[in-house]
């Protein structure tokens, strides 16, 4: 018999990864109240209704850059799991040092 749990497979099978959501659906997951809460935390009192789409695009590009750098650190270390330190180093590389997570 071949390897694997079922007995009829052809060798080892890697772990199933999450299916990728479409970009439009995932960016719309950042709701207006979530953007409003972020703005409140930053000290904003009133928010124009035109700001939400722009905020989503800016947040998307920022996170894409951070995640790309964090994954680069992870791949260089030959790991499959992105650690908090990978994210800290990615932010530091972009000039946004984050304290409180080691390193």
Swiss-Prot record:
Its main location: nucleus. It comes from the Eukaryota. The modification N6-acetyllysine is found at residues 5, 8, 12, 16. Keywords: Acetylation, Chromosome, DNA-binding, Nucleosome core, Nucleus. Residues 1-12 have a biased composition (Gly residues). It is found in: Nucleus; Chromosome. One of its GO terms (cellular component) is nucleosome. InterPro entries: CENP-T/H4_C (IPR035425), Histone-fold (IPR009072), Histone_H4 (IPR001951), Histone_H4_CS (IPR019809). SUPFAM superfamilies: Histone-fold (SSF47113). Pfam families: CENP-T_C. Residues 1-29 are annotated as: Disordered. Belongs to the histone H4 family. The nucleosome is a histone octamer containing two molecules each of H2A, H2B, H3 and H4 assembled in one H3-H4 heterotetramer and two H2A-H2B heterodimers. The octamer wraps approximately 147 bp of DNA. This is Histone H4, major. The lineage of its organism: Eukaryota, Sar, Alveolata, Ciliophora, Intramacronucleata.
